Amino acid sequence: MYIVAISLLSHTIWIQGVFFLFGLALGVISAFKIFTKTLAQKNEVIRNLEHDKAILQMSLDARRNQEQLIEEFSHKLTSVSQAFARDIKTESQEFFSEKTQAIHSVLAPMHNTLSVFKQNLENFETKQAEDRGALREQLSQLLTAEKKLERETQALTNILKHPGSRGRWGEIQLERILEISGMLKYCDYSVQTVDANDSSSRADIVIRLPQNRSLVIDAKTPFSEEYLTDSHADPTDLVKKIKDHIKTLKTKSYWDKFDQSPEFVILFLPGESLFNDAIRCAPELMDYAGQSNVILSSPVTLMALLKTVTYVWKQENLQNQIREIGQLGKDLYQRMHKLFDHFHKVGKHLGQAVHSYNDMSSSLSARVLPILRTFDKLEISSSHNKIEGLSQISTLPHSPKVPCQEPPLSECFSHQDTSSSDPLS
């Protein structure tokens, strides 16, 4: 039983062993399959990982290349930026320097102009202040002068109320105009001249004219006290007094009592207002005076007439100088003619002297000089200087010639019209 049991046990153990081995084999097979599958999966995973690794490596390489490119680009960008910044800075500095210079060149004249304008403005303000001060001073002086003039006018009005004072005032005005015209008392004119044949004919002023002629001027102050004090006075009385005085001058006939005097006399009215009022009241007054050989004259017209007389005197003096120059020209021509005669005589004698010198030189050279040179050959002379021959003079004096056939100077002046014409004709 025991053996059977052992056999059964052995058989059981063997079966169990077989089953164990079979199970183990199945397990090994399963495990191998699982391992194989797992290995395949692992290999797949490894391949995937290697692929991913390759991709990652490529990405990493690309990234590294990108980083390197970025770094290189960054360096290049930095260098380019720095160079660009330097160029921009240089160009901007040059640009701003040029623009600054241009602005300075534009603003410099403006600055100078503004400086000059400021200086001129300051000078103008200073001068304006000085002018205002001077103007105030002049206004003060003007007021003082106006007051003084008012007093003197009143005094003159009081003086001119008397007929004798009015006449003297007219004569003084006439003499002042003569002085302003450049005439000298007792030289160009005389005062209160009396005719030698008629002591009652006393002319206020007698103007000297060329060729011993005379021009008579009579001063008249024909206004009344009413005309002097009243600005609205009727000038009819003034015209009446002027006409009465014209009749008096016509009666005196000064042009017959002074030698070579023009056939008229000048009636001087010592005021433009007198002349204008008289002509305005009586326009025919000038014709009325002309018919009586009287010429009415105001201060302005008389001054123009005196300037004409001065011009006539200048022309007379010019003609006298021309006559004197003509006489001097004649004398100079005669003296130069005599001087040229002396020149001709001197030239003639010089020519004769040259011919005589040449004849003597020829005679000495032909007759005396050969003998003297013989003495030189005999060594008799103690001097070592040899006698030189005499040279001929070939240049003869030339007589002065007249450059052109002009008429003699005396004839030029002889044709000059030295006759003096009448300055008032």
Swiss-Prot record:
The keyword Coiled coil applies. Signal peptide: none annotated. The keyword Coiled coil applies. Residues 37-66, 127-162 form a coiled coil. Residues 392-425 are annotated as: Disordered. Residues 413-425 have a biased composition (Polar residues). It holds the Pfam family RmuC. Keywords: Coiled coil, DNA recombination. It comes from the Bacteria. GO terms for biological process: DNA recombination. Involved in DNA recombination. Belongs to the RmuC family. This is DNA recombination protein RmuC homolog. It comes from Chlamydia muridarum (strain MoPn / Nigg).
